[in-house]
Amino acid sequence: MKIIVDADACPRPVLQSCLELGHKYDVPVWTVASFNHHIESDHHIVVGNASQEADLKVINLTQRGDMVITQDWGLAAMVLGKGARCLSPIGREYRNENMDFLLEEREIKAKLRRAGGRTKGPRKRSVEDNLRFQRSLEKLLLAIPPHPHP
């Protein structure tokens, strides 16, 4: 098992929590980001700046039982299909049961924006968001039976 972080748009406190909890539970943490981001990590993969390049690398790295951290609903759906667990930076676990709704909502908002409409962006990140993420990740790490990693 490994933690894979879609680090292109990952808040620093989330990345820090992943690194700390990965160390605490002896789970390797892989970060994937374009060359525009400076990430300090033992296992960092730099990708180009092309559209979806980081997402494709995350998908290719992901194996059954891994934990993926992303705010991209499309990427979340893909890694769930590979048997991974997936958590948002605000600590919400993505599940197969809620992906259809999230992807439909994303499509509706995209259509509205293409038609010239506006959609509400995410609210400002709070300290509570950071704590919720850390608690959620630790809870999921504790629930996964340990097995050796390569």
UniProtKB/Swiss-Prot annotation:
Coiled coil: none annotated. It holds the Pfam family DUF188. Signal peptide: none annotated. It comes from the Bacteria. HAMAP family: UPF0178. Belongs to the UPF0178 family. This is UPF0178 protein Swol_1505.
